[in-house]
Amino acid sequence: MSNNLTKREIVLTIYEKTGFPQKEVQATVQMTLDIIQKALAEGRNVELRNFGVLEVQVRKQRIGRNPNKPEAEVIIPQRAVVKFKSGKILKQQLKKLDLVKLQA
């Protein structure tokens, strides 16, 4: 079984906890993700209190190597990336994780 939480699982969990129709929950979850994606695409940070912050940052131009031709240097242009900073409550919850189970 995968260790990933999918959008479908989020929809089903909300449906089970609230009893709202799955189509409405699916639409609401998708709308939320669309709003977050649009804000990030505009260069805005997204702050979700007690969870974390999605920050748009610029990754500088750098020199990389082609794995097929290690002698050839490749210029990797600067680009925008999204970085996640966990909030205080999430950090506390992560400290309680069983790291041995996580690595298995």
What are these regions (language model features)?
Residues 1-104:
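Strongly charged
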